[in-house]
């Protein structure tokens, strides 16, 4: 489950 990847992705 990508949680931090999603946060870094939108950054």
UniProtKB/Swiss-Prot annotation:
Source organism phylogeny: Eukaryota, Metazoa, Spiralia, Lophotrochozoa, Mollusca
Similarity comment text for this entry: Belongs to the tachykinin family.
Pyrrolidone carboxylic acid, modified sites: 1
Positions of post-translational Methionine amide modification: 11
GO biological process: neuropeptide signaling pathway
Record organism: Eledone cirrhosa (Curled octopus)
Primary localisation category: secreted
Summary of the function given for this chain in its UniProt record: Tachykinins are active peptides which excite neurons, evoke behavioral responses, are potent vasodilators and secretagogues, and contract (directly or indirectly) many smooth muscles.
InterPro entries: Tachy_Neuro_lke_CS
Places the protein is found: Secreted
PROSITE patterns, per database record: TACHYKININ
Identification of the protein by name: Eledoisin
């Amino acid at each position: 489950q990508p949680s931090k990847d999603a946060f870094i992705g939108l950054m």
